[in-house]
């Protein structure tokens, strides 16, 4: 992987990640394909929304169908017929989401498979091996996702364990030519985040991610961590904010220097009739849309908006038709990509402030202030 930084506008950055399989223009949003599929979408449909990369979930793919069958296909790209880059998460977040079904030790995490109850030990080494078997282009280290809320001691202990696992992940990654990203932890404590980042930089990674956000904390706490941490992340490496989020969160994070995002929100919300448009949100199952012959978003160039009315989408939702979820997903993913395209173009033109003002004005919202934190 090669990372090129073209230009900046304030703290916002415009660049690209270059792989043998393709280029990812940044800032980038990555749709989530948990089980090797973006729910309800073919790979060509995902590409048509403007996506240049997608996510696979190490934890879920390890359990079903298992890495052996994926290896027999020649890796995840061929298994799912996706020839653009793939990022795989380490499985850490999913393991820690199991709660009482798992036990954390220095070695790793022992958990009961939610599929068949089998006891499985997941370690930094095994996570690296699974991701090597999947053949992903970007591999994430195995870390502990610090829960929220957490005391400073709990966050410190968790962060230090993640650092020890980061070193083992780097060693386990070995001669794998794929890019390896470190994950900054430390809960809602900027000092712990700084210690985590320093430790990760000492080990050395191809990119750096902020983990442990969007885990239930109030938005102001997430923004505070971004204010204190994003601009300090290595300038010559891609910066990835994991699991975030709403369109407004993407804009605010880009303003603070983040390059990469992933979130299930556009796809999950689409299946629940919650659709993102230029002026905010449309809840398509509400009765007001029953007789609306207009498009979902007149400014959107997606297949859904170009061919179907709000009334039709409302009808499909009410009848629980699979096509409704598919058309909604096409639109939401395209909307997210349009936001990212707008951000990229604005940064390139030195007009990010104008883009941000227009983005919020169309929603009837004020532009949030940027904190002046530079040390």
Swiss-Prot record:
Its cofactor is Zn(2+). It catalyses: 7-aminomethyl-7-carbaguanine + guanosine(34) in tRNA = 7-aminomethyl-7-carbaguanosine(34) in tRNA + guanine. SUPFAM superfamilies: tRNA-guanine transglycosylase (SSF51713). InterPro entries: ArchSynthase1/Queuine_TRR (IPR050076), TGT (IPR004803), TGT-like_sf (IPR036511), tRNA_ribo_trans-like (IPR002616). Residues 243-249, 267-271 are annotated as: RNA binding. Substrate binds at residues 89-93, 143, 185, 212. Binds 1 zinc ion per subunit. GO terms for biological process: queuosine biosynthetic process; tRNA wobble guanine modification; tRNA-guanine transglycosylation. Zn(2+) binds at residues 300, 302, 305, 331. Keywords: Glycosyltransferase, Metal-binding, Queuosine biosynthesis, Transferase, tRNA processing, Zinc. Its EC number is 2.4.2.29. One of its GO terms (cellular component) is cytosol. GO terms for molecular function: metal ion binding; tRNA-guanosine(34) queuine transglycosylase activity. It comes from the Bacteria. Pathway: tRNA modification; tRNA-queuosine biosynthesis. The active site is at 89 (proton acceptor), 262 (nucleophile). Transmembrane segments: none annotated. Catalyzes the base-exchange of a guanine (G) residue with the queuine precursor 7-aminomethyl-7-deazaguanine (PreQ1) at position 34 (anticodon wobble position) in tRNAs with GU(N) anticodons (tRNA-Asp, -Asn, -His and -Tyr). Catalysis occurs through a double-displacement mechanism. The nucleophile active site attacks the C1' of nucleotide 34 to detach the guanine base from the RNA, forming a covalent enzyme-RNA intermediate. The proton acceptor active site deprotonates the incoming PreQ1, allowing a nucleophilic attack on the C1' of the ribose to form the product. Belongs to the queuine tRNA-ribosyltransferase family. HAMAP family: Q_tRNA_Tgt. This is Queuine tRNA-ribosyltransferase. It comes from Pseudoalteromonas translucida (strain TAC 125). The lineage of its organism: Bacteria, Pseudomonadati, Pseudomonadota, Gammaproteobacteria, Alteromonadales. The gene is tgt.
């Amino acid at each position: 992987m090669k990372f090129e930084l073209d230009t900046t506008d304030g703290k916002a950055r415009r660049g690209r990640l270059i792989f043998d399989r393709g280029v990812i223009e940044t800032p980038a949003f990555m749709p989530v394909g948990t089980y090797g599929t973006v729910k309800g979408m073919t790979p060509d449909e995902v590409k048509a929304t403007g996506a240049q990369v997608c996510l696979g979930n190490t934890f879920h793919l390890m359990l079903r169908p298992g890495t052996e069958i994926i290896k027999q296909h020649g890796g995840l790209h061929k298994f799912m017929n996706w020839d653009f880059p793939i990022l795989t998460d380490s499985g850490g977040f999913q393991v820690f989401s199991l709660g009482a079904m798992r036990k954390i030790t220095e070695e790793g995490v022992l958990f009961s498979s939610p599929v068949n109850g089998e006891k499985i030990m997941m370690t930094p080494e095994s996570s690296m091996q699974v991701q090597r078997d999947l053949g992903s282009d970007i591999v994430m280290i195995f870390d502990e996702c610090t829960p929220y809320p957490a005391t400073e001691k709990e966050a410190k202990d968790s962060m230090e364990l993640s650092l020890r696992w980061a070193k083992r992940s780097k060693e386990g990654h070995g001669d794998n030519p794929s890019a390896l990203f470190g994950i900054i932890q430390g809960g809602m404590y900027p000092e712990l985040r700084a210690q985590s980042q320093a430790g990760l930089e000492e080990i050395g990674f191809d990119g750096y991610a902020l983990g442990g956000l969007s885990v239930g904390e109030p938005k102001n706490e997430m923004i505070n961590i971004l204010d204190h941490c994003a601009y300090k992340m290595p300038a010559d490496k891609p910066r990835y904010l994991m699991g975030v989020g709403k369109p407004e969160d993407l804009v605010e994070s880009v303003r603070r220097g983040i390059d990469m995002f992933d979130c299930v929100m556009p796809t999950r919300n689409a299946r629940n009739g919650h659709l993102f448009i230029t002026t905010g949100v449309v809840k398509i199952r509400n009765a007001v849309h029953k007789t609306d012959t207009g498009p979902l978003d007149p400014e959107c160039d997606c297949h859904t908006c170009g061919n179907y009315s709000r009334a039709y989408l409302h009808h499909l939702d009410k009848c629980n038709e699979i096509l409704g979820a598919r058309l909604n997903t096409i639109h939401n993913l395209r909307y997210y990509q349009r936001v990212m395209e707008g951000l990229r173009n604005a940064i390139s033109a030195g007009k990010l402030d104008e883009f941000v003002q227009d983005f919020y004005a169309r929603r009837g919202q004020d532009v949030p202030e940027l904190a002046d934190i530079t040390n």
